[in-house]
Amino acid sequence: MPIDIGKLGTTSTSAQSQSTFLFECSEPVPFEMAWLWQQQWQQQLFANPLAPQAVWLLQHQACYTLGRGASEANLLFDVNNPPAALHRIDRGGEVTHHLPGQLVVYPVLDLRRYQTDLHWYLRQLEQVLIDVLAVLGLAGERLQGLTGLWLEGRKVAAIGVGCRRWITQHGLALNVDCDLESFSAVVPCGLVGHPVGRLNQWIPGLTMAEVQPLMRQSLSDRFGLVWQIPEPLAKPGAFASDA
């Protein structure tokens, strides 16, 4: 489908452009590997507050993650015999399902360069998603008191972040053309009565290759990011911690 990337907004929430490495993976990545990459970059920013930030755009191999304090009651399977890898991690929120066909975004940003306010940051991530969907002709919706993004009552994007010393990790997951059947093994985000959806239910044939450039542009606009592009991550293990 034709997409007008020029429809994305140009107003940044930062008065100063931020040099940021952009890593894009061409193959699904194991969750624990992507988590390690974020932790490594977080450590670099702890050591050098002037270091570039980083963002990962990727897909995961199938897995389920539980946020801090998340209830295992939202897992509709035996935790000793999960249908896919299960991880308890250091982000907010309840259970999330990752799988191919879902665009996952992991910004490792220093909020001291923006606003030291996690609620502000969550709303910015929601706006990134709203702007992406607007280019596609879709009206993404927030729900009062909840975090994420909905289309016609179906949750199409989950957001869960971690933050140490104002350096972020984890991020958002947007369902593009993924198989929704495996979401039935959990109560997504712990929200009973809130079905999940994917973008190609509204735009048949929509692909990750069409959505990913829109996500890059929306992130750049929203956070004033100037991308530094390293060598492509053709294989999951290609990232070097001293990049």
Swiss-Prot record:
Origin superkingdom: Bacteria
SUPFAM superfamilies per UniProt: Class II aaRS and biotin synthetases
Subcellular location: Cytoplasm
Any one GO molecular-function label of the UniProt entry: lipoyl(octanoyl) transferase activity
InterPro entries from the UniProt entry: aa-tRNA-synth_II/BPL/LPL, BPL_LPL_catalytic, Octanoyltransferase, Octanoyltransferase_CS
The name this protein goes by in its record: Octanoyltransferase
Keywords, alphabetical: Acyltransferase, Cytoplasm, Transferase
Site (Lowers pKa of active site Cys): K155
Catalysed reactions, semicolon-separated: octanoyl-[ACP] + L-lysyl-[protein] = N(6)-octanoyl-L-lysyl-[protein] + holo-[ACP] + H(+)
UniProt KW Transferase keyword: yes
Subcellular location, principal: cytoplasm
Residue positions of the active site: C189
Residues in BPL/LPL catalytic domain copies: 49-227
Family named by the database record: Belongs to the LipB family.
Gene transcribed to yield this protein: lipB
CDD domains: LipB
UniProt key word Aminoacyl-tRNA synthetase: no
Pathway: Protein modification; protein lipoylation via endogenous pathway; protein N(6)-(lipoyl)lysine from octanoyl-[acyl-carrier-protein]: step 1/2
GO biological processes: protein modification process
